[in-house]
Amino acid sequence: WTNLQWIEWGINNGIDHGVLGAAKDNPQWFHSFRDVPNPEDNPHIFHPKEYRKGFVTPRSLETASDMAKVRHLMDDQTFTASLIGSIGMRTAMDLATHLKLADQLPTLDSIKTDPKNAIVPTSAAAKCMIVFRTLAVIEKEWINNWMDYLVRLDRVSYARRN
C-alpha cells in the first residue's frame, strides 16, 4: 500500500480523520524495507536488519484509528501507551503529537502549492513538528516552496543551537 491508497481505503472504512491526516503527511509509514537499505533511515517500519518491538503497518494503523476514536475516554499517557503497543514507539509519538496539534498544522499540500498562505502555527511544538515532518519527506520539486514557507517560521523553529 501507498499512503494514498490506504487513505482512500480508510475514507471508505471509517478511519479517524486525524489518523488519515497523519498518514497523508507521513508517506514513509508505508514504505517497504526493500526500498530502505539502512533500517535507521526509516524507524517506523519493519526491517529485517534491525529488531523493533513495534512498527507501523496498514493493519496496525487501523487499530490506532480505533484507539484515536475513543481517546477522549483516556488520559494522554494511556492513549500514547496504547498507540505504542500497536504501531511502535516512534510512530506512536508522532501520531499522538499530530492528533494533539492537528488543528495548528498546515498540510504538506498547502506548503507545496501555496507556501505564502499556508497556516503558521503558534505553538513551538507544532512549528518543530512541521520542520521535522517536512525534512522526512521533502523532494527537490518543491524545495523552493518549502523555503518560502520556512522563512515565515521564527528562526528558533529551525535553527540549530551549538
Where do the PLM segments sit?
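C-terminal regulatory/interaction module of P-loop NTP-utilizing enzymes
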Residues: 1-162
